[in-house]
Swiss-Prot record:
Gene from which the chain derives: proB
Subcellular location: Cytoplasm
Record-given protein name: Glutamate 5-kinase
Any Pfam family matching the protein: PUA
Reaction(s) catalysed by this chain's protein: L-glutamate + ATP = L-glutamyl 5-phosphate + ADP
Organism: Ralstonia pickettii (strain 12J)
């Protein structure tokens, strides 16, 4: 089945709209543009699709309301602008969706909300309940309390995380660009447009400029990485221009617009997906070659004897990263021991744990049922 048909058949969509598509060149909200987005999403709802909207624009609206001509550099001022602007963003979306008799809900999330298992499940339950009630959730990062997301702004990642959270069928990232090219078309006249590819392939990241490039910072690279993340849960991604007329309706009808990135695998188990979606891990363990082989090829649990080093501070039950000697992450899992305990039993046989600690919580540092390979 063609990817376009898969998108057309998708029941649950996450739509991410960038700041340039909802603001007047960064100076306050463009209510006419938001009205068009509301109309398009209303049409999707009428066609039987569930839609979650991830929208930027709060800081731009806050600056307008506060009378600031230039974007401030101080984090606390950006946070203040976000707090003021979030009111306007919610008001405009509410009024425009009301024209179509659709209720909206404002949901502000942080990475911490999705890293904590209980809060993650609560957020998931709330969003699924809203969708079942016919409500369109409007999601944004809680910029008022988060600093890194303002500094490096990345609602593309948030869109992917939300897609995984609600087990969405597809992520649609709308931007002011047509999609992905083999090179920067502004600099390379030979750049070719990529209409379809498999998400997560290394070539895509190179096309987008690679990590740390001038092209990639806050640009296409974040979208490529978001597609890679969404693909882990079996969701396909479309990167398309929000300037295209009726782009959502046309995509939903199966029309080929933008770059279509196919998920290579089926949906992952929910708990393992949650572990992969951790953006900030508090600890990691370095494994010897034998442990790496047993995890990746043998499907075994991680035993303390295979750990050569414990880095960071973490508690029992937290998600930790498992890396090889070169620092390459090979797996993630829920640890049965704290970092302090892990340091004591590292390089020890499981039979020695009780002699070292005085007790045994488990024979494994990470059981294979609580382990996900990357």
């Amino acid at each position: 089945m063609a990817l376009h048909s898969l998108i057309a058949d998708a029941r649950r969509l996450v739509v991410k709209v960038g700041s340039s598509l909802v603001t007047n060149d960064g100076r306050g909200l463009d209510q006419a543009a938001i009205a068009r987005w509301a109309a398009q999403i209303a049409a999707l709802r009428a066609a039987g699709k569930e839609v979650v909207l991830v929208s930027s624009g709060a800081i731009a609206e806050g600056m307008q309301r506060l009378g600031w001509a230039k974007r401030p550099k101080e984090i606390h001022e950006l946070q203040a602008a976000a707090a003021v602007g979030q009111m306007g963003l919610a008001q405009v979306y509410e009024s425009e969706f009301a024209r179509h008799s659709i209720r909206t809900a404002q949901v502000l999330l942080t990475h911490g909300d999705l890293a904590d298992r209980e809060r993650y499940l609560n957020a998931r339950s709330t969003l699924l309940t809203l969708l079942s009630l016919g409500v369109v959730p409007i999601i944004n990062e809680n910029d008022t309390v988060v600093t890194d997301e303002i500094k490096f702004g990345d609602n593309d990642t948030l869109g992917a995380l939300v897609t995984n959270l609600i087990e969405g069928d597809a992520l649609i990232i709308l931007t002011d660009q047509r999609g992905l090219y083999t090179a920067d078309p502004r600099k390379d006249p030979g750049a070719r447009f990529v209409d379809e590819a498999q998400a997560g392939t290394p070539d895509l990241e190179q096309m987008a400029g690679g990590a740390g490039s001038s092209i990639g910072k806050g640009g296409m690279l974040t979208k490529i990485l978001a597609a890679k993340r969404a693909a882990k849960s079996g969701a396909h991604t479309i990167i398309a221009s929000g300037r295209e007329a009726d782009v959502l309706a046309r995509l939903a009808s199966g029309e080929a617009i933008g770059t279509q990135l196919r998920a290579p695998t089926g949906r992952m188990a929910a708990r393992k997906q949650w572990m992969i979606d951790h953006l900030q891990l508090r600890g990691r363990v370095v494994l010897d070659a034998g442990a790496v082989e047993k995890l990746t090829a043998g499907g075994k649990s991680l035993l303390p004897i295979g750990v050569t080093e414990v880095q960071g501070e973490f508690a029992r039950g937290e998600v930790i990263s498992c890396v090889d000697a070169a620092g390459l992450e090979v797996a993630r899992g829920l640890t049965n021991y704290s970092s302090a305990e892990a340091r004591l039993i590292a390089r020890k046989a499981s039979s020695e744990i009780e002699a070292v600690l005085g007790y045994v919580s488990a024979a494994e540092l990470v059981h294979r049922d609580n382990l996900v390979l990357l």
